[in-house]
């Protein structure tokens, strides 16, 4: 394999080691680089690149270019992307894009593999009959839930959500026996969310938890719990930002919206189109 030879660097000269290092760092760029461009980028010459390709067992740069890119693409798709530090300071834009795409795909795959479809049916049936849905979340979780709220409103489902945590206890106290209360928290220990759940539990209200922590307060106090298998730290001191958890929560809420919409597809489609028409009409007046 070309990649293996580039990593071992057996019998490489200093110049060849420099070329190998460049290729391993900027492999995706090679697809569109001429031999002259690669020579300039590695401070070598076209003849040096040609000799290097032959040393790798190939008869020229063109063949090397095709085979190397194919191997490099497969090589970079191996392994697990660190959810806390999915890219490094040395990565190219293309490498960052591929790593984030891989992290997102892997996050959704793991989320789907953990779904209990009987549970999802129970939750969706309860949501469909609810007088309203209260969302208890803060920070990133609340940002994800905001889009869910907007989507649900399109077919007439009331979702209460606030970006100010001081209002969460009020939602808990006004919840009825027909209200679905949805708590979203990665750690499952956010103080404002947990305190609201205590009020809900005291009043024997129905609660659904979405969390990454199975033994958390949120998981223990909710009748239904959707767990996400995400190896991402809670503290921003231990990660670049929130990537995997955001993707997992967003995907789950997208599924919830889709399940509810599908329950009465024709009616919901009609309602969303009517709302879109009225909104358009009001803007034109």
Predicted regions and their residues:
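CheY-like receiver
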Residues: 22, 123-126, 171
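Short, Lys/Arg-enriched N-terminal segment that forms or immediately precedes the first helix
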Residues: 1-9
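Glycine-rich phosphate-binding loops that contact phosphosugars or nucleotide phosphates
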Residues: 128-247, 251, 255-263
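Pre-recognition alpha-helix immediately N-terminal to the DNA-recognition helix
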Residues: 18-24
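Glycine-rich phosphate/diphosphate-binding loops that line cofactor/substrate pockets in enzymes
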Residues: 118-130
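A short, charged, Gly/Pro-tolerant segment at domain boundaries
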Residues: 264-285
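HTH-adjacent hinge/linker in prokaryotic transcriptional regulators
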Residues: 2-3, 14-15, 28-32, 40-43, ...
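Generic structural signal for well-ordered, non-membrane alpha-helical segments
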Residues: 12, 16, 35, 42, ...
């Amino acid at each position: 394999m070309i990649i293996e030879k580039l990593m071992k660097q057996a019998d490489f000269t200093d110049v060849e080691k420099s070329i190998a290092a460049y290729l391993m760092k900027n492999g995706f760029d090679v697809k569109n680089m001429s031999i002259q461009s690669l020579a300039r980028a590695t401070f070598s010459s076209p003849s040096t690149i040609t000799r290097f390709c032959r040393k790798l067992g190939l008869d020229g740069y063109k063949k090397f270019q095709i085979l190397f890119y194919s191997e490099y693409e497969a090589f970079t798709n191996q392994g697990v992307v660190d959810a806390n530090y999915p890219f490094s300071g040395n990565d190219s834009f293309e490498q960052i894009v591929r790593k984030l795409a891989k992290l997102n795909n892997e996050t959704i795959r793991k989320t789907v593999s953990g779904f209990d479809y009987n549970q999802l049916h129970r939750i969706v049936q309860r949501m469909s009959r609810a007088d309203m849905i209260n969302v208890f979340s803060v920070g990133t979780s609340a940002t994800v839930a905001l889009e869910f709220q907007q989507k649900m409103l399109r077919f007439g489902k009331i979702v209460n959500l606030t970006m100010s945590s001081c209002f969460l206890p009020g939602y808990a106290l006004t919840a009825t026996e027909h209200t679905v209360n949805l708590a979203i928290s990665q750690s499952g220990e956010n103080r404002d969310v947990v305190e609201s759940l205590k009020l809900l539990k005291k009043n024997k209200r129905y609660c659904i938890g979405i969390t990454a922590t199975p033994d958390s307060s949120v998981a223990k106090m909710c009748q239904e719990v959707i767990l996400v298998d995400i190896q991402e730290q809670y503290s921003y001191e231990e990660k670049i930002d929130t990537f995997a958890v955001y993707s997992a929560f967003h995907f789950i809420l997208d599924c919830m919206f889709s399940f509810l919409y599908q329950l009465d597809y024709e009616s919901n489609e009609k309602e969303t189109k009517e709302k879109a028409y009225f909104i358009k009409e009001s803007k034109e007046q």
